[in-house]
Amino acid sequence: MKSPFGGIAETLKPKMEDFKVFLLNQAETFENGVRAAARAAISPNGKYIRPMLVFASAPADADEKSLVRRATIAELVHLSTLIHDDVIDRADMRRNSETAYKKYGAKTAILLGDAIFSHMMSLAFEENSMAVLKKTADCVRTVCEGEIKQTLADRAEIVSREKYYEVAYGKTAALFELACNLGATAGTPPDGWREAAENAGKQLGIAYQIYDDICDWFMTERDAGKTLGTDLISGKQTFPLIALLEKLPAEQSASLAKNLPNEQPEKIAKLMRSFGIPEICAAEFSRRVAAAEESLGKFPAVNTGLLEFCSAMRNLKFG
């Protein structure tokens, strides 16, 4: 399936090629007994969305070597969280390959995620910037807290949209925001650009989480390249389900929320379609992308990459 991000990836091709070489070389820094697992985890099969955001946010005077390192920092944060997510979700497939959890078991996968995270912090230290270290550490904490909040949430209680956005920020948008920050601060941006880029990253991150939620309900595992259906099994109330619960009568809504893990996904997906849930999700997705574009519209001369990224987001297919 053709990537909707192919256009911006082509625009950023020289930088992305340097990044990929640098990223894959990071696996070679691990000890012999860990290197094979690190190579599999730091694979060349990702979409590299977060590194693209780093490059797309950078002012013209950004140092290229620093940018590549910052893009790698963003991707390694993402990879370490994916490894841990797969353990939590007991997922067997990621990026059309077996997950570390499937290959090595939960204990080794958790330690591998920790090792990659630790290596990422070592790279962040090389930036010789307390701001980079603090922003990165704060982001990781926010991501972990977002996952914890969703895991500990009362499954029988109907989650509000506001609560969902809070969790979505922690799970996904905080890392998009970090990537935009790392790019924007790699040079000397005009006043307000960092804040505008960060806000765009936040809005795009929430939009992407909504897209990811939709994939779990309406996309095939072959097209998604990963294990699907884990949200239902774990009883997580993602955006499509929350939108459905809003539409159902109170009694039916409460019953569905309470019995979610025992429900048939096909039955719920059919119900979602009957209530126009995919269209509701698409509308909220578009609203978030528009908010990102509005934030960036005040800085047309800094870097058009983020606006191009917004256009690519609009090409994502909702199942």
Where are these regions (language model features)?
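All-alpha prenyltransferase/terpene-synthase fold signal
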Residues: 1-319
